UniProtKB/Swiss-Prot annotation:
GO molecular function: NADH dehydrogenase (ubiquinone) activity; NADH:ubiquinone reductase (non-electrogenic) activity; quinone binding
PANTHER family, per database record: NADH DEHYDROGENASE
Cell compartments where the protein resides: Cell inner membrane
Keywords, in A-Z order: Cell inner membrane, Cell membrane, Membrane, NAD, Quinone, Translocase, Transmembrane, Transmembrane helix, Transport, Ubiquinone
Protein name (database record): NADH-quinone oxidoreductase subunit N
Swiss-Prot/TrEMBL catalytic activity: a quinone + NADH + 5 H(+)(in) = a quinol + NAD(+) + 4 H(+)(out)
EC annotation from Swiss-Prot or TrEMBL: 7.1.1.-
Keyword Protease: no
Bilayer topology: Multi-pass membrane protein
Primary enzyme class: translocase
Length: 512
């Protein structure tokens, strides 16, 4: 036997790797152009921060904004360049309408975060330029999570995002609470990564492939292959549930949200959550079996229902607004995952877009208000309307949208999602519909408390007494754009228009 005959090792598939050319061509590279721009830009920023050791790293800040804008444009270019659902890198990468919109969400949220954060870093005396490269690397991981069609690639991309977030949360090294939040998130995040890796191993054991479509095919087969695939998928979904912060895998969320710098919290609540939910959505669009009354509908459905109830009940008693938004994000994740369990795609995507903008806007205002106090609570914002009426109006618009009050975008996002659930006749979807409507009504209480505190309280809060910081250009721009999207901009992206616009851009021949 020839020991150098690689064909005797079919399990490792080394012969194919060695004998076939794996050099990517230009179309392959262009298919991941947004990720390439972000990754290359992150490395360039690290080099730039060494060359220009200015105290406030102004050059690094502006160059990072330029790179994010280039990445945003690269998403459109990639969509025009590869119309329709295209596969690249031997099926490892897929450019689709879904990945197009998700990538726009991630990069938009990163741009908003980069605009908000400079003055926050200055106020906390954080003089580390690494913040901006880490932001780019985390966003790069999100884009690869969305376009990746191989479990190994998806896992590596998810870990790239997670590791960057661990560091970003602990950026305020002098704050012990921030370090505690980092440790909790890191330990539980590592635990969830173990679940995902074990799930991938079982999926590979049942199918012999790590390609997502191929690995899920044994779900329809009886015997050990089907059982391996089922165990693997359950473990993988469990790991993703940690990242989404679904109940009961949510324990890291309140402390991580409160301990991190507020712009980082906003980025986690929007881009990172959208990336994890987007991964689950893509996974469920590739299931080779119907969802009606199946185990794969009940599993995320139960997690979604428990998340709605738990998140809203715990948010009721929170005084700190960041912790309240943390529990609120658990509830909102429940609403979105309820749609995924019902096989709904377009309404889930619309909900993610609207939620991202209203959440980012709320955190942008909290970041601004924190300049007058250590923590923003219900008591510290009392009588805010008397001192800063525009700020009080803006923050209440975002909270009313999060609560689902018409005519704001959050109301329509919930309405479209609940309408789709109502059209289904399955028991699980009916339960989720009742749970969603009931919990939305429950959420009104703690969101309306903000309006009462800011406009109707006779007491004067700490922020009303001490806050004298001027509006920054970055925060003002982000808040105004988010207000526009939440108030009227959502109309352009309603379900029916959303995928149609995506298909229109993907089918355009302007760059071909």
């Amino acid at each position: 036997m020839n020991l150098f005959d690689l064909s005797i090792l079919p399990f490792l598939n080394l012969a194919q790797v060695v004998n076939e050319s794996r050099v990517p061509n230009v179309p392959d590279l262009l298919s991941v152009l947004p990720a390439l721009v972000l990754a290359t830009g992150g490395v360039f920023l690290i080099c730039l921060s060494v060359l220009f050791k200015t105290k406030e790293f102004i050059i690094v800040r502006y160059v990072s904004g330029l790179i994010l804008l280039l990445a945003f444009a690269a998403v459109f270019y990639t969509s025009f360049r590869f119309p329709g659902n295209g596969f690249h890198f031997s099926g490892q990468i897929e450019n689709s309408v879904l990945s197009f919109w998700l990538n726009l969400i991630y990069i938009s949220m990163a741009i908003g975060t980069a605009a908000i954060v400079p003055r926050i870093l200055k106020n906390h005396k954080i003089e580390f330029p690494e913040f901006y490269p880490l932001l780019l690397f985390a966003t790069c991981g999100m884009t690869l999570m969305t376009t990746g069609q191989d479990f190994i690639l998806v896992f590596v991309a998810l870990e790239l995002m997670s590791i960057c977030l661990y560091i970003l949360i602990g950026m305020a090294r002098s704050d012990l609470f921030s370090l505690e939040a980092t440790l909790k998130y890191f330990l539980l995040g590592s635990f969830s990564s173990g679940f995902m890796l074990m799930g991938i191993a079982f999926l590979f054991g049942g199918s012999g492939s790590t390609n997502i479509t191929e690995a899920l095919k044994p779900l329809t087969i009886a015997g050990y292959q089907g059982n391996f695939a089922k165990i693997g998928l359950v473990l993988f979904i469990t790991g993703v549930a940690f990242k989404i912060a679904l109940f009961p895998y949510h324990a890291w969320t309140p402390d991580a949200y409160e301990g991190a710098l507020t712009p980082v919290t906003g980025y986690m609540s929007t881009a990172a959550k959208a990336a994890s939910i987007g991964l689950l959505l893509i996974l469920y669009t590739k299931l080779p079996l119907p969802l009606e009354n199946s185990t794969w509908a009940w599993l995320p459905g139960i997690l979604a229902l428990c998340s709605m109830i738990y998140g809203n009940l715990l948010a009721l008693k929170q005084e700190n607004l960041k912790r309240m938004l943390a529990y609120s994000s658990i509830a909102h994740a429940g609403y979105v995952v309820a749609g995924i369990s019902a096989g709904i795609k377009e309404e889930v995507l619309f909900y993610l877009i609207v939620y991202s903008f209203m959440s980012l806007g709320a955190f942008a205002i909290l970041a601004y208000l924190e300049e007058g106090t250590r923590q923003v609570t219900f008591f510290s914002v009392q009588s805010l309307s008397g001192v800063k009426p525009l700020t009080a109006i803006a923050i209440n618009i975002f909270f009313m949208s999060l609560a689902g009050v018409p005519p704001f975008g959050g109301f329509w996002a919930k309405l479209f999602l609940f309408q789709k659930l109502a059209e289904s006749e399955t028991l699980m979807n009916r339960i989720l519909l009742i749970g969603g409507v009931t919990n939305s009504a429950l959420a009104l209480y703690y969101y309306l408390r903000i309006g009462i505190a800011t406009f109707m309280s006779s007491d004067e809060g700490e922020i009303s007494r001490n806050h004298a910081a001027p509006y920054s250009v970055g925060v003002t721009g982000v808040v105004l754009f988010c207000l526009l999207m939440v108030s009227v901009g959502w109309f352009l992206l309603v379900p029916g228009n959303l995928l149609a616009l995506g298909e229109l851009w993907l089918s355009s021949s302007i760059f071909r």
